[in-house]
Amino acid sequence: LNDSANTTRMPGKYYTLEEAKELVAFCKAHHMTLIPEIDMPGHSAAFIRTFRHDMQSPEGMKILKLLMDEVCETFDVPYLHIGTDEVQFTNPRFVPEMVSYVRSKGKKVISWNPGWHYKPGEIDMTQLWSYRGKAQKGIPAIDSRFHYLNHFDTFGDIIALYNSRIYNKEQGSEDLAGTILAIWNDRLVSTEWGMIIENNFYPNMLAMAERAW
């Protein structure tokens, strides 16, 4: 997966296992919750190029479980995000089986909404990414629907973020877990620092924090 031949953006850019562990330690020292995301089964073209198997195939699921073993061992954190957005599901067993497997490793599981449709108890938390995403009673939701930064979108305007309300509610609840401000560079930015600058990350982060306290 780390081979530059299998990636289309920023070849050779990845975290080593030691760097990943250092990042976990840094976040803990600064009282932040790190949530690793391993996109499945969508946004996984590099997986297919590397292993020559679709994630939803029996062979792909075997490989993915081995990767989850390594991820769960490397990241000493409570949550793991599994994606499940923007994909056609061809294997109805895929998501339930992967959620169960990650939970068996002692992790709570987060999934995008819209994505796979869960009932209470089938997932630990969802993250709303589109106006079509709806919080479900009994499943805590993170509201990121209009709280993401992309220098081609207007949602990340600092004034709009400051004046927004998380899920249009005055305060959180057992079903509303807050917000995450995400940088989604659908248009390629050449460097990591360029992403921070072009998306006006720090001012926007502070504005959104005022809504989330």
Tell where the protein language model's regions lie, with residue ranges:
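Substrate-binding cleft of carbohydrate-active enzyme catalytic domains
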Residues: 1-105
